[in-house]
């Protein structure tokens, strides 16, 4: 892992298309501004991990589980 020290207003450049700028510092929090291509997904780590976990749970459903859920949901429609 590369560890860098930056001051307010200073920027880190990653490759040709990504720039990370220190926008604000309050106590123990740092606000970062990120410039990147629109098709690049950028997540806070806690959100990224949650999405990964939910995707894994959804992928673990079997065809039988899905059929049961569909049958259950449609049971009261008649």
UniProtKB/Swiss-Prot annotation:
Transmembrane segments: none annotated. Its main location: cytoplasm. Gene3D superfamilies: Translational regulator CsrA. SUPFAM superfamilies: CsrA-like. Signal peptide: none annotated. It holds the Pfam family CsrA. GO terms for biological process: bacterial-type flagellum organization; mRNA catabolic process; negative regulation of translational initiation; regulation of bacterial-type flagellum assembly; regulation of carbohydrate metabolic process. Keywords: Bacterial flagellum biogenesis, Cytoplasm, Repressor, RNA-binding, Translation regulation. GO terms for molecular function: mRNA 5'-UTR binding. It is found in: Cytoplasm. GO terms for cellular component: cytosol. NCBIfam families: csrA, PRK01712.1. HAMAP family: CsrA (MF_00167). Homodimer; the beta-strands of each monomer intercalate to form a hydrophobic core, while the alpha-helices form wings that extend away from the core. Belongs to the CsrA/RsmA family. This is Translational regulator CsrA. The gene is csrA.
């Amino acid at each position: 892992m590369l560890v860098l020290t930056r001051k307010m207003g200073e920027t880190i450049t990653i490759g040709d298309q990504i720039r990370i700028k220190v926008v604000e510092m309050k106590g123990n929090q740092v606000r970062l501004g990120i410039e990147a291509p629109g098709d690049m997904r950028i997540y806070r780590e806690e959100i990224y991990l949650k999405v990964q976990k939910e995707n894994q749970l959804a992928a673990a459903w079997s065809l039988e589980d899905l059929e049961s859920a569909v049958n259950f949901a449609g049971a009261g429609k008649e």
